[in-house]
Amino acid sequence: MRLIAHLLPLLLAGILPSYAKDEATTITSAGDGALVLTGSITTSISEATLPTGDYLSYTSTITLSNDHTTGTSTRVGVSTITDASSSGNATATTTSSRSSTSSNSVTLLVGGGHHTMNGTANATSTSTTSATSTPVVNTQPCNGYSDFCSRKYSNITMVAAHNSPFVKPGNAAANQAYKVTDQLNDGIRMLQFQTHLINGTLYLCHTSCEMLNVGTLEDYLTTVTTWIKTHPYDVVTILIGNYDYVDPGNFTAPVQNSGLMDYVWTPPKIPMALDDWPTLSNMILSGKRAVVFMDYQANQTAYPWLMDEFSQMWETPFSPTDAAFPCTEQRPPDLSVQDAKNRMYMANHNLNLDVSIGSISLLIPNTAMLNQTNAVSGYASLGRMAENCTDTWGRPPNFLLVDYYNYGNFNGSVFAVAAEMNNVTYSGTCCGTASAAPIVLPGPSMLGTLFVVVGVSLVGWMF
């Protein structure tokens, strides 16, 4: 029996053809965009259940040594980052004898005087100070805003692209309209996706590689690395979904071969509490500007750079179908309020439809509500959820996870919400240069109807 080849590929256009096809299934057209399936469906595919796995907890903090970096890299460059409250400057030259060596010449505007420093990796230094009356104002943005340079990584709200690589015209399993380079150019600073291990190679697939396979993890990370190389003042977060719960060692080769390892940031301790994170300027000056998390099976003892998500970040309800978007903690389960307040958190704001056909259960983006879901205000809006989370937890979410970030009540509305949470003003342009996967926004009328005759009945919204 052949595995299902196509299930629901044109929901975005208001027509939902079959993604379920085997030798005992026949598909006929009823005209006017309607489709009739007859026969039997024997393959079981399910994404409409809450992912779960082993959740790590620590009774004490583990301090990491400085020799945990994998691979060797050399960086030589000059950077200038200034703080809005700074009134002086410092020049530092640093060399390192670690396996990952670096040689930097850095101009950093900090403090209240003119400092010249010479230091080594053992943190010993000498300095000379001379008074200056010239005030210095930061003009170099970090992650798009000069105010962010002096802020801790854990004190910034970032927009996250849910299933970032899944860009495919006319495929219901797609979650974004623009490819990753456009996403990063527009202001996305977290890239989230799921991986599947097939014959020793990690692929980016949505639920099943027969449903949507957009290529290898290595190719995707190579594109991301190219962007990071050319944007030296940006910190990018990557959240890997380990769908098959494979050993974390499988992820080392794609990260190394893509060149990303040269930029991967490694925490000084495990786990990282809310106040343990460095500032963006610290990360930028170190050259380590890629923060990598994995949801399940992370082993930071063996791979310190591949950080366990749920011991350092919690999430609101997974793939929500409730437009009220409650800001309650769901994963990891049974987390105390005190522990939740002491780590970062992500607001899942990607509204879904739960579609079931026989033994197939899928969560697909509710495209009918995209303009409202990604809006700055109103019922079901990203803005309202962000405000609710801030009121509930006393601080804004660190990450706002969204589908089709380019839609909302205006172009860039999701970034405007993040800017409000960060107490800055969004003035960017959005979105993309040319759509990599144009979608048809649902209109007010019904464009298609699906009839399924497999012993079950499905009534779906086709807009």
Show which residues each predicted segment covers.
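Catalytic cores of phosphodiester-bond hydrolases, prominently lipid phosphodiesterases
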Residues: 2-463
